Amino acid sequence: GSRVSPDGNFHYSVAMMSGELFEIDAVDLSVKRILSLDTNKHHRNAMHHSRVKPTWVTPSPSGKELYIAGNGSNKIFIVDVEEWKVKQTIETGEGPYNIAASSDGKYIIATLKNEGAVSVWSTDKGRQISKIKTSTNIPHGVVISPDNKYAFVSVEGVGGEAGKVDVI
C-alpha cells in the first residue's frame, strides 16, 4: 500500500516481501530514500523475506511521521520522516493490514486481518483506545471521514458471500 505526503511532494510505498519503505519524489519519480523495517538500515538489502511484512503506509496529517502496518510482526511502525528512522512501534492484534490517520492527527485505525477486527490507537501515547469486531472475519481497507466522525472499513466476503463496508 502507498500514499502521497500531505504537501504532495513525496509518494511513500512499502514492499511486503523485502520489508522496505520507499520515499519517491512525486515529480520526477526517483527513489529518494529506502528504509529497511527489519534492520532499520539506510540502504537496500539483498532481497529476503521480511518478518515485518509491511502492507500499508500512510503519512500523519503534518507529514512529519509515517504509520506503517507490519502484518507479519503484529506492530505499527512510526517513522520519523526527517530522521528517516523508526521512532516507535505499537503492538497490535494479529495481522495489521491497512491503516488510516485521523485528519487531526490524534488517532490511527488499523484493520486486523487475522482477528476480524479494527483497532483505534491514540497517537500521543500509542495506547489502544478500542478494538471493534467487523461484520465478517476478513477486514481489509479503512478510511476515516474528514470530520473524524466515522471510519469506513471494507470487509471481504467469504466463499460466495459478497463483501461489505462497515461504518464505525
Q: Model-predicted segments: where are they?
A:
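Predominantly soluble domains enriched in secretory-pathway, periplasmic, or organellar proteins
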Residues: 1-168
